[in-house]
Amino acid sequence: MGAPKQKWTPEEEAALKAGVLKHGTGKWRTILSDTEFSLILKSRSNVDLKDKWRNISVTALWGSRKKAKLALKRTPPGTKQDDNNTALTIVALTNDDERAKPTSPGGSGGGSPRTCASKRSITSLDKIIFEAITNLRELRGSDRTSIFLYIEENFKTPPNMKRHVAVRLKHLSSNGTLVKIKHKYRFSSNFIPAGARQKAPQLFLEGNNKKDPTKPEENGANSLTKFRVDGELYMIKGMTAQEAAEAAARAVAEAEFAITEAEQAAKEAERAEAEAEAAQIFAKAAMKALKFRIRNHPW
């Protein structure tokens, strides 16, 4: 039999949450190798982090694993809450209410990250979701758990907050504000950030011909590119120089990977075209041979 598993300490749980917020879910090796969390999580493995994160996700919604199992069996289909103006009555905490809890004897006195930050009240959940996606600054988008953890870290949340976040994310992705790709949410290409000015349409001149940019076939690609650029700029706004350099390096790596794939696809297309030409030549030669045999056959 293996050694009994050690109980997770508050410091380890806080480090795990902070690691997921920084690197995203599923990046267990990256979290363990990060110098910010490696010292606290030195006695944990990838499987430990994965199992603990699953337990945290369950208890964050239902309060306990037993309640979660019972709720999944008994919960009737609830009514949709798509009203964006529904205010959540949450009392804002002051700095005095956010004092760090004393650590247990023999434990490390570092405490959990971001423990002394004051939490704000929530008035519009959609704005808070936009803030979370923007501040998490994940180029591929943020998953639902990361968004909820950001809200939980910065706001005082009720027990059923995760369900509200899930409902709002589903609504925002259905109306086109957000795009959901592989369980991750990001701003859609036609999303205009608050405060961004939209330029009036202009006429483009090419020689003596005037083109109307309001036609979708002529200006659709330019508008789509502009909105995508605005969305990316809004995502990386406020990045430090190091974070911007890392984001640029990731973008370059993705572009190089896309170029490599395109080159491979082009080579495969050329190979298929050459094979098709060879097959066509062989078919013509076979047809000529057949006609020659028929013509010279002694009947």
UniProtKB/Swiss-Prot annotation:
Transmembrane segments: none annotated. Residues 243-288 form a coiled coil. Residues 1-61 form the HTH myb-type domain. One of its GO terms (biological process) is nucleosome assembly. Forms a homodimer and heterodimers with TRB1 or TRB3. Interacts with TRB1 and TRB3. HTH myb-type domain confers double-stranded telomeric DNA-binding while the H15 domain is involved in non-specific DNA-protein interaction and multimerization. This is Telomere repeat-binding factor 2. It comes from Arabidopsis thaliana (Mouse-ear cress).
